Curated annotation (Swiss-Prot):
Organism this protein belongs to: Gallus gallus (Chicken)
Domain remark text: A pair of annexin repeats may form one binding site for calcium and phospholipid.
Entry's Gene Ontology BP terms: apoptotic signaling pathway; calcium ion homeostasis; calcium ion transport; mitochondrial calcium ion homeostasis; negative regulation of sequestering of calcium ion; neural crest cell migration
Domain of life: Eukaryota
Protein family: Belongs to the annexin family.
SUPFAM superfamilies xrefs: Annexin (SSF47874)
Protein name per its UniProtKB record: Annexin A6
Protein's UniProt keywords contain Protein biosynthesis: no
Record's keyword terms, sorted: Annexin, Calcium, Calcium/phospholipid-binding, Cytoplasm, Repeat
Annexin-type repeats, residues: 18-89, 90-161, 173-245, 249-320, 361-432, 433-504, 519-594, 598-669
Localization in the cell: Cytoplasm; Melanosome
Length: 671
């Protein structure tokens, strides 16, 4: 139940008028005869607290001389059986069973070890160790040590001690020192001093560590998660990231784990079951709130879409409510949103591409290699890919000139005649300057039947003033008309106003103005009808002012605006836009907000969506891989693996052929 002095945040509560003997009778009747009444079983068990379920087990034994868990195992099957049986165990014994399964047999389920040991309180760890000893007559630490290795093992052993300082222990004089020690142990040292990391992350109180992470961000300019990813790899990296996430917000950590358990093809049912069971009487309401905020979908609806039968019914009972139906935003979610904007506002991100200028570059030599690859019968696509994906755009422009000078031929025309399909689109795109390529993509988005609004927004919302100016010039030169005219003639009124404003390239590029940020946040709140005091402005006037703020304020300033917005309304701006706006304008506003928050994450999400499910959106995939290859594709790779538990390289690799080879070359490596 809830810790003393805190509001209960579980979804499962004690059943009023509880009678263990009557419940034991009801379960016995549900399992009598041919078949069993699964609905009766799930309705009863999911509506009782764990303490009440244990009393039912005792009453069942007393009345029928039989083991209730054994009978349930006999009557039920599959995922539903695993879920119901998990509910019948005390939490510590349920954790012990999960860990025993994780280390039994060949191989170890490291993710299960990480999830449990990174997220439990001191008391929960002590109870787990005792339950493991009682259930299996074995020492948990000895089994973990025997089944793991290296620094991963050392960190698990530290966590198994359950010796973290309690949350009211904050050594303010040590905060700055711990932050410096973490920085010196990682970023500033050749190799990482894991012992220092392990001690601080494994022993300091959560409240103390939150202050350490804030201090670390100030002195290093980057969140500690980014440093961990850069310095470490494998299970040790995953464990440390899990500890950091649980320190920041256990609810957010579990929301992310639940989302990853259900997204994409297939469901990780063991993960889904264990989290839904283990958090149902602790913080399920907080998890639901964070889930709704982060993924713009309620946990209830995701379970509903991803599962079936009695298994689904039981999970939904544990979830308890549908936050999409409530359409509310909650304090826990607001805290998470505020922290995300705070991180975005103060982090100093070093943008890094995957394609660098080739050393010992020889434009004439490359021109000769390309000519040889296209002469005679057949084409050597491999040679073309190897040269052009390993040169910077500036070097490719030199190759174009050298090819013309050496052979009197147009390299673009030759490539176009020799290549076809997706590979041709990719290689020809690489040969254009960034501005020419963006101009061409914008032209394709506005010509023909229908307008590709998503592409228009992606390009216009993510380019800086200098890039926008170059695109305008390239567009005029290539198509003999202004980009603004084409955008105006092919889009709706409000959407047109937004695109034209972005096309002017008049975004301020200075730092934030805190006074102005507060005033801008008021305008945003009034526009989205979340202000305490109604505005005298018309809705059209407010929308125009909101549009102006989004299109002309600097990114650092907008981050502060959206942070102020959370403080002012207890809502996240992206969530509010999705709820209160519609159509192309809503999608464009959301794209701008997500780009402001974290541009690499914005592109990582678009890349994932271009490849998930059946078929690949090659146009989007090609466009982003080309346009970001020399800017921030390395950052995008980092965000991709963090968001989707799979590297960008692995996601691309599922395809085959020369197009895939070229994409992998641009990707630049597997994370």
């Amino acid at each position: 139940m809830a810790p003393k002095g805190k509001v209960y945040r579980g979804s499962v509560k004690d059943f009023p008028g509880f009678n263990a003997s009557q419940d034991a009778d009801a379960l016995c009747n549900a399992m009598k005869g041919f078949g069993s009444d699964k609905d009766a079983i799930l309705d009863l068990i999911t509506s009782r607290s764990n303490k009440q379920r244990l009393e039912i087990c005792q009453a069942y034994k007393s009345q029928y001389g039989k083991d209730l868990i054994a009978d349930l195992k006999y009557e039920l099957t599959g995922k539903f059986e695993r879920l119901i049986v998990s509910l019948m165990r005390p939490p510590a014994y349920s954790d012990a069973k999960e860990i025993k399964d994780a280390i039994a047999g060949i191989g170890t389920d490291e993710k299960c070890l990480i999830e449990i040991l990174a997220s439990r309180t001191n008391q929960e760890i002590h109870d787990l160790v005792a339950a493991y000893k009682d259930a299996y007559e074995r020492d948990l630490e000895a089994d973990v040590v025997g089944d793991t290795s290296g620094h991963f093992k050392k960190m698990l052993v530290v966590l198994l001690q359950g010796a973290r300082e309690e949350d009211d222990v904050v050594s303010e004089d040590l905060v700055e020192q711990d932050a410096k020690d973490l920085l010196e142990a990682g970023e500033l040292k050749w190799g990482t001093d894991e012992a220092q990391f392990i001690y601080i992350l494994g022993r300091r109180s959560k409240q103390h560590l939150r202050m350490v992470f804030d201090e670390y961000l100030k002195i290093s300019g980057k969140p500690i998660e980014r440093s961990i990813r850069a310095e470490l790899s494998g299970d040790f990296e995953k464990l440390k990231l899990a500890v950091v996430k649980c320190v920041r917000s256990t609810a957010e950590y579990f929301a992310e784990r639940l989302y990853k358990a259900m997204k994409g093809l297939g469901t990780r049912d063991n993960t889904l079951i264990h989290i839904m069971v283990s958090r149902s009487e602790i913080d399920m309401l907080d998890i639901r709130e964070v889930f709704r905020t982060k993924y713009d979908k309620s946990l209830h609806n995701m379970i509903k879409e991803d599962t079936s039968g009695e298994y689904k019914k039981a999970l939904l009972k544990l979830c308890e409510g549908d936050d999409d139906a409530a359409a509310e935003f909650f304090p826990e979610a607001a805290q998470v949103a505020y922290r995300m904007w705070e991180l975005s506002a103060v982090a100093k991100v070093e943008l890094r591409g995957t394609v660098q200028p080739a050393s010992n570059f020889n434009d004439d030599g490359d021109a000769q290699v390309l000519r040889k690859a296209m002469k005679g019968l057949g084409t050597d696509e491999g040679a073309i890919i190897e040269v052009l994906t390993q040169r910077s755009n500036a070097q490719r422009q030199q190759i174009l000139k050298a090819y013309k000078a050496h052979y009197g031929r147009d390299l673009l025309a030759d490539l176009k005649s020799e290549l076809s399909g997706s590979l041709a689109n990719l290689i020809l795109g690489l040969m254009l300057t960034p501005a020419q390529y963006d101009a061409k993509q914008l032209r394709k988005a506005v010509e023909g039947d229908g307008t590709d609004e998503s592409t228009l927004v992606e390009i216009m919302a993510t380019r800086n003033n200098q890039e926008i100016a170059a695109i305008n010039e390239a567009y005029q030169q290539a198509y003999h008309k202004s980009l603004e005219d084409d955008l105006s003639s092919d889009t709706s009124v409000h959407f047109k106003r937004l695109l034209v404003s972005l096309a002017l390239g008049n975004r301020d590029e200075g730092p934030e103005n805190l006074t102005q940020a507060h005033e801008d946040a008021k305008v945003v709140a009034e526009t989205l009808k979340l202000a305490d005091v109604p505005s005298n402005d018309s809705s059209d006037s407010l929308e125009t002012r909101f549009l102006s703020i989004l299109c002309t304020r600097s990114y650092p300033h907008l981050r502060r605006v959206f942070q102020e917005f959370v403080k002012m309304t207890n809502h996240d701006v992206e969530h509010a836009i999705r709820k209160r706006m519609s159509g192309d304008v809503r999608d464009a506003f959301v794209a701008i907000v997500r780009s402001v928050k974290n541009k690499p994450a914005f592109f990582a999400d678009k890349l994932y969506k271009s490849m998930k499910g059946a078929g690949t959106d090659e146009r989007t995939l090609t466009r982003i891989m080309i346009s970001r290859s020399e800017i921030d594709l390395l950052n995008i790779r980092g965000e991709f693996i963090d968001l989707f538990d799979k590297s960008l390289y692995q996601m691309i690799e599922k395809d085959s052929g020369d197009y895939c080879k070229a994409l992998l070359a641009l990707c630049g490596g597997d994370d």
